[in-house]
């Protein structure tokens, strides 16, 4: 029997014999992925995760995985004629994502819960569910590319820099990457995605993109934290770098590194910025803009995606990104172990905050080499 040519998902069999679970949030991106694969003849199974209490989020626009989104995902499945399931992951999501989100702010960090959700829920539990459903792979609507390299599948930035989500997916492991597919990563723009949705007659073709953190109604994260951790907003002192008290703050959770507005300490001359948070002393430390300049960034919990082990070299020349909204910059990784390193930024950056991710890219290439979490001690 002749070998079957590879289908569009990389399997040597017909699409009809290839089962793919599509993680459906109810938004246009994952809906287009499911519709395109169904139209190609794949054995598509749509799965949507119910992640949190939908009471407040039911009518909230701009969230993902809310009650309305589950309804939209179901309508897309009905339109395209494939099965769709909703799984209750509220307890898992709270334990794996929301609790850490609250605790991180209490510790003076600025967390990125979307990364933890991908790492601990979508690409862990949901991926295992896909395998339990005898799927050959799982597809998502993320804007990122999976390319085959000499050592196996590699993670690459999306073709559209404006939509690239590589910063939020650095913790994808090689084992997960082998099972995952990202059909939208090659598209040149979001307009192409919406055009595909319209072509398939999907009810979500004009649905707005998701905004903010899905479990934070109206973007008021401090309110969510106070409900989860009573006493989180205890007031304290605002002090300068010498320890001089300049005023009182409303609780450390209301502030982040680099913040200038809303400090309530105007009239002191040059603008002052939050340069450090000390939750133990309940202090917000402020200073001039130059005090924000950071060159050395301690990084831990590193997920390394390079072909050679991280510790096989004393230094790695990379491009590094310390915030999702910033461009990557030249940097040097100096490994301390398989999962910890000191990262030197060739040009200092302002506002490097504990709790954010530091993501590594190959110089002159679109490949993601991994990343880790910024820890205290950046200087």
From Swiss-Prot:
Active site: 117, 214
Annotated stretches, region: Interaction with tRNA: 163-165
InterPro entries according to UniProt: MnmA-like, MnmA-like_C, MnmA-like_central, MnmA-like_central_sf, Rossmann-like_a/b/a_fold
Keyword Cytoplasm recorded: yes
Domain of life, source organism: Bacteria
Residues that hold ATP according to the record: 23-30, 49, 141
Record-annotated site: Interaction with tRNA: 142, 356
EC identifiers of the protein: 2.8.1.13
A single Gene Ontology CC term: cytoplasm
Biological process according to GO: tRNA wobble position uridine thiolation
Disulfide bonds: 117-214
Main location per the UniProt record: cytoplasm
Keywords: ATP-binding, Cytoplasm, Disulfide bond, Nucleotide-binding, RNA-binding, Transferase, tRNA processing, tRNA-binding
GO molecular function term, any single one: tRNA-uridine 2-sulfurtransferase activity
Localization, UniProt: Cytoplasm
Database matches in Pfam families: tRNA_Me_trans (PF03054), tRNA_Me_trans_C (PF20258), tRNA_Me_trans_M (PF20259)
Catalytic activity entry: S-sulfanyl-L-cysteinyl-[protein] + uridine(34) in tRNA + AH2 + ATP = 2-thiouridine(34) in tRNA + L-cysteinyl-[protein] + A + AMP + diphosphate + H(+)
Enzyme class: transferase
Keyword Iron-sulfur belongs to the record: no
Function: Catalyzes the 2-thiolation of uridine at the wobble position (U34) of tRNA, leading to the formation of s(2)U34.
Similarity-based family: Belongs to the MnmA/TRMU family.
The name this protein goes by in its record: tRNA-specific 2-thiouridylase MnmA
Naturally occurring in which organism (per UniProt): Cereibacter sphaeroides (strain KD131 / KCTC 12085) (Rhodobacter sphaeroides)
């Amino acid at each position: 029997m002749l070998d079957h040519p590879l289908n569009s998902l990389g399997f040597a069999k017909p699409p009809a014999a290839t089962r793919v679970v599509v993680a459906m949030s109810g938004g246009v991106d994952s809906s287009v992925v499911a519709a395109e694969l169904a139209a190609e003849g794949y054995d598509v199974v749509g799965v949507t995760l119910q992640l949190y209490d939908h009471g407040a989020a039911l009518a909230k626009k701009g969230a993902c995985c809310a009650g309305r989104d589950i309804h939209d995902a179901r309508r897309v499945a009905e339109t395209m004629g494939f099965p769709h399931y909703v799984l209750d992951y509220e307890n898992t999501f709270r334990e794996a994502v929301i609790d850490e989100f609250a605790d991180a702010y209490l510790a003076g960090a600025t967390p990125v819960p979307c990364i933890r959700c991908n790492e601990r829920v979508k690409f862990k539990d949901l991926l295992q569910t896909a395998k339990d459903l005898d799927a050959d792979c799982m597809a998502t609507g993320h804007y990122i590319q999976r390319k085959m390299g000499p050592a196996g599948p590699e993670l690459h930035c999306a073709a559209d820099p404006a939509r690239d989500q590589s910063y939020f997916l650095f913790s994808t492991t090689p084992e997960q990457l082998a099972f995952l597919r990202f059909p939208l990563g090659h598209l040149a723009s979001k307009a192409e995605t919406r055009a595909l949705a319209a072509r398939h007659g999907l009810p979500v073709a004009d649905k707005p993109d998701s905004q903010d953190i899905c479990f934070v109604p109206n973007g008021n994260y401090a309110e969510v934290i106070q409900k989860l951790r009573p006493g989180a907003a205890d007031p304290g002192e605002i002090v300068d770098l010498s320890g001089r008290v300049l005023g009182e703050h409303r609780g450390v959770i209301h502030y982040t590194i680099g913040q200038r507005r809303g400090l309530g300490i105007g009239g002191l001359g040059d603008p002052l910025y939050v340069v450090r948070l000390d939750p133990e002393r309940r202090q917000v430390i402020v200073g001039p803009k130059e005090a924000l300049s950071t060159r050395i960034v301690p990084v831990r919990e590193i997920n390394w995606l390079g072909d050679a082990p991280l510790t096989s070299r004393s230094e790695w020349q990379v491009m590094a990104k310390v915030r999702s909204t910033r461009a990557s910059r030249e940097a040097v990784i100096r490994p301390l172990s398989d999962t910890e390193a000191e990262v030197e930024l060739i040009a200092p950056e302002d506002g490097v905050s504990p709790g954010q991710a530091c993501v590594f890219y190959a110089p002159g290439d679109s490949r993601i080499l991994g990343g880790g979490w910024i820890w205290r001690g950046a200087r």
